[in-house]
């Protein structure tokens, strides 16, 4: 693990950091029994960067302790509020027939959006996500029954669109009809485990319905999402060390809370 911390691949060194933080926390009272290990840790932290990274990992691990509270808030407050306002949003006059230069944003939409309380809920969800909170646990908890998740190691497998299970089930390609979904899967919004769940779920949705779901996005949304600079920004965000370590912690959390074999292991959370 200590060798892996210095690996050039960010996926490797960040995962190693997470595991080191967990091991040091669980076995902190035994560290003094291994002076050579203490020496190695001191050498790694000569410039202070190792300690700063560990501190960041510990904060992320502490934040994961709030997942149940956030999950409850999502299920009981935020999601119901969003569902309650679906009909309002659908029946609202968006003003597409108006000259876009005269009115870029429909005031009726903004007023109803704020008065419904939906705006506050969405902002709250966005703030939680920006802080690194696990806001998707409740959404994906019911999507872990696929055969893929029967193997414990698959819960921690870095997401790969060329994984045999993806190709066999979905035939996902980075171009063509799946381009939008591919871009979403390359972003840092979801942890690896949830990306696999999303793929398997989409694979079982008829093509017509899948197209209808994607068609819900306006042409402007699609253009923005496919914009080269913005799509590049999404990919860069996904490669940030703090995003990778946080996603790995979310993967671990899902395994210890949702896996059918979770009772065979000590719950580190």
Feature map (PLM): residue ranges:
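HEAT/HEAT-like alpha-solenoid repeats
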Residues: 2-6, 42
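Residue-level detector of extended alpha-helical repeat arrays and alpha-solenoid scaffolds
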Residues: 13-14
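Alpha-helical repeat scaffolds
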Residues: 31-45, 73-79
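Extended alpha-helical scaffolding regions
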Residues: 71-143
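Alpha-solenoid helical-repeat scaffolds
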Residues: 157-269
């Amino acid at each position: 693990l200590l060798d892996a911390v210095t690996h050039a691949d960010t996926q490797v060194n960040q995962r190693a950091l997470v595991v080191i933080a967990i091991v040091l926390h669980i076995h902190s009272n035994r560290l003094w029994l291994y002076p050579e290990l203490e020496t190695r840790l001191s050498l790694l932290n000569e410039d202070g960067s190792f300690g700063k990274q560990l501190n960041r990992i510990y904060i992320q691990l502490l934040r994961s302790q709030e997942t149940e509270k956030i999950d409850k808030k999502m299920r009981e407050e935020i999601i119901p509020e969003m569902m309650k306002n679906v009909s309002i949003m659908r029946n609202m006059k968006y003003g597409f027939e108006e000259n876009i230069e005269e009115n870029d944003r429909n005031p009726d939409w903004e007023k109803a959006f704020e008065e419904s309380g939906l705006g506050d809920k969405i902002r709250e969800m966005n703030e939680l996500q920006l802080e690194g909170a696990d806001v998707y646990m409740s959404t994906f908890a019911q999507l872990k029954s696929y055969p893929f998740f029967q193997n414990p190691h698959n819960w921690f497998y870095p997401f790969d669109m060329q994984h045999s299970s993806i190709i066999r089930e979905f035939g996902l390609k980075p171009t063509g009809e799946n381009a939008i979904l591919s871009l979403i899967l390359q972003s840092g919004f979801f942890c690896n485990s949830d990306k696999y769940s999303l793929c398997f779920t989409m694979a079982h949705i008829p093509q017509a319905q899948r197209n209808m779901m994607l068609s819900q996005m306006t042409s402007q949304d699609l253009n923005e999402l496919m914009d080269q600079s913005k799509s590049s920004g999404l990919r860069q965000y996904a490669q940030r060390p703090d995003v990778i370590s946080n996603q790995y912690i979310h993967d671990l959390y899902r395994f210890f809370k949702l896996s059918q074999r979770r009772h065979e292991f000590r719950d580190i959370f």
